[in-house]
Design a protein with these regions (language model features):
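Glycine-rich phosphate/diphosphate-binding loops that line cofactor/substrate pockets in enzymes
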Residues: 8-19, 61-67, 91, 149-154, ...
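Structural signature of the thiamine diphosphate
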Residues: 20-21, 64-75, 80-101, 124-176, ...
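Thiamine diphosphate
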Residues: 31-106, 108-110, 114-115, 263-274, 278-282, 309-311, 396-474, ...
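Active-site diphosphate/adenylate-binding microenvironment
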Residues: 7-11, 15, 20, 28, ...
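Phosphate/pyrophosphate-binding active-site segments
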Residues: 137, 173-175, 199, 295-391, ...
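Glycine-rich, acidic loop regions that bind phosphate or pyrophosphate groups
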Residues: 101-142, 241-346
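Glycine-rich, anion-gripping cofactor-binding loops and their flanking helix/strand elements
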Residues: 64, 213-299, 405-435, 448-451, ...
Length: 561
């Protein structure tokens, strides 16, 4: 058998796993791998990011649309440590990515060699699994294991740290390498719990379905729709659950959470049975835990056994994949008329519309509002674009007002709330979905954290539409300081550079929008452009995002103003 280097074995292993794109940044300790990658240019597209954090976020965006792990490769030391924020982000949101980092030679480990960093020790808390390869013979098996772990059970990030000597030494490549299937926890009472869940839902007077990111991760959108239609159940999404059920669906009642819709939050505490599936009851959704859903019998379904009964005790806790569970539960469900109960949600919608929505979506004078920008984008794209939102007020506005009609249409940083996520994530999303319209909605603060990825967009000739909602402030922090810190605005005002000149430097067509009359025509030009386009839209400086559940308050204490 012909011998090949560890770096060549790595490339062969990645090709075996179906890898067609790598986001990366070369350096000393990973150069043998990049040399091997040179021979795979026809099979693997390498995207040269401008910062290693961008590689991790791009891999996340790619994974969200491709439905398979995104892959990033960087060098040792600062290259590897720069990945950590992106890895932690993927861990929080259950995004499967495979990170490969170079490392100093095995003989130099522990000597404080140039660009040595204890990567395995650093990333262990924020990965599903990580491993350091010191021998080329390990490569084939370890890569297979990494992809298996990243995509099985609750998905998430894995990291392979490969020493330089393992990259250069020769080995006999084992092309048949397979990983041992991970043992899953078998619940002997699963069928009994399934029937109990069905009985609770069939007998409920005020049933309520809450769904999260687990629906999209399990590819269970069709099963969710059939289930809620069979039972006539009102259904609400978490932030990351958005687009798993079309917003236009008559049984979709809105978004949960701190800046979610009025009805879904207000009526949580009036439901008598709640089915929570593919969500983990994080603090943005529950509000004050002791006051959460006091009248409800809760059925909690999650792929991660550790999430069950972790925050909110469940009457029935079921460890299951969302797709499998819904497919088995739906035949047991009886259709009932819950129109009176759903009517309560619609009454809340009317109140929210009167107090908040109309003012935000259709301001009659003054500065442009964030909401009207999102409304126009939604109308012009018919709710079918991929919205990649950064973190802050604009994230909540995009979630609330874009009319998602197509699955896998909202990509954002949920659990970690990483500013700077959107621009690099949109790179990965566009490469995974080249035929889909990808629109990055970003705040002026977030944009400046990763704006160097405009260079990646330029070099890769990607068509990404970028909208900066520019309020010259760190808007969400400013809102909290206004509401809860006696208007003591501590370091939230931003003196920004000329974003249009920056876009010019990257050869990206752009416009500055200050006047409402100019907004719609500019959006038309942006959306019809063949390549990338940037709009810097000046929005109201002191605009607040409502509804809002104050920190520490119960969900039914949600405020409209």
């Amino acid at each position: 058998m012909e011998k090949i280097s560890g770096a060549q074995a790595l490339m062969k292993s990645l090709l075996r796993e179906g890898v067609d794109t790598i986001f990366g940044y070369p350096g000393g300790a990973i150069m043998p791998v990049y040399d091997a990658l040179y021979d795979c240019k026809d099979s693997i597209r390498h995207v040269l990011v401008r910062h290693e954090q961008g590689a991790a976020h791009a891999a996340e965006g790619y994974s969200r649309l491709a439905g398979k792990p995104g892959v990033c490769i960087v060098t040792s030391g600062p290259g590897a440590t720069n990945l950590v924020t992106g890895i932690a982000d993927a861990m929080c949101d259950s995004i499967p990515i495979v990170c490969i980092t170079g490392q100093v030679a095995e003989a130099a480990l522990g000597t404080d060699a140039f660009q040595e960093a204890p990567v395995i020790g650093i990333v262990t808390p924020v990965t599903k699994w990580c491993y350091q390869i010191t021998n080329a013979t390990e490569v084939s098996h370890i890569v297979a294991k990494a992809f298996h772990i990243a995509t099985s059970g609750r998905k998430g990030p894995v990291l392979i740290d490969i020493t330089k000597n393992a990259q250069t030494e020769l080995c006999e490549y084992d092309d048949s390498a397979q990983t041992v299937a991970l043992k899953s926890r078998h619940d002997p009472y699963y069928q009994k719990k399934l029937k109990r869940a069905a009985a609770l839902l069939n007998n409920a007077k005020r049933p309520y379905v809450l769904f999260g990111h687990g629906i999209a991760l399990a590819n269970a959108e069709d099963e969710l729709r059939l289930f809620v239609e069979k039972g006539g159940f009102p259904a609400a999404s978490t932030l990351l659950g958005l687009s798993s059920l079309p917003k236009s669906h008559p049984l979709y009642v809105g978004m949960l959470g701190m800046h979610g819709n009025y009805g879904p939050n207000k009526l949580t505490n009036r439901a008598d049975v709640i089915l929570a599936i593919g969500m983990r009851f994080d603090d943005r959704v529950t509000g004050k835990i002791s006051a959460y859903a006091p009248l409800a019998k809760i059925i909690h379904v999650d792929i991660d056994y550790a999430e069950l009964d972790k925050v909110i005790p469940a009457k029935v806790a079921i460890h299951s994949d969302a797709k499998e569970f819904l497919a088995q539960l739906t035949p047991l469900i009886k259709h009932k008329d819950h129109s009176a109960w759903i009517g309560k949600f619609r009454e809340c919608d009317k109140e929210e519309k009167k107090v908040v929505v109309d003012t935000e979506l259709y301001p009659k004078s003054g500065e442009i509002s964030m909401a009207e920008v999102v409304r126009l984008v939604s109308e012009k794209t018919h709710g079918k674009a991929v919205i990649v939102a950064d973190v802050g007020q604009h994230q909540m506005v995009a979630a609330r007002y874009y009319g998602f009609e197509t699955r896998d249409s909202y990509i954002t940083s949920g659990g970690l709330g990483t500013m700077g996520f959107a621009l690099p994530a949109s790179v990965g999303a566009k490469i995974a979905g080249p035929k889909r319209d990808v629109i990055a909605i970003i705040g002026d603060g977030s944009f400046q954290m990763t704006l160097q990825e405009l260079g990646t967009i330029m070099q890769e000739k990607l068509s990404i539409k970028i909208i900066i909602l520019n309020n010259r402030h760190l808007g969400m922090v400013r809102q909290w300081q206004e509401m809860f810190f006696e208007e003591r605005y501590s370091f939230v005002h931003m003196e920004n550079p000329n974003f249009n000149k920056i876009a010019d430097a990257y050869s990206i067509p752009n416009e500055l929008i200050k006047d409402r009359k100019a907004l719609s025509p500019a959006l038309e030009r942006m959306l019809s452009a063949k390549g990338s386009y940037l709009l810097d839209v000046m929005v109201k400086k002191d605009e607040n995002v409502f509804p809002m559940i104050p920190s520490g308050a119960a969900v039914d204490e949600i405020r409209l103003k």
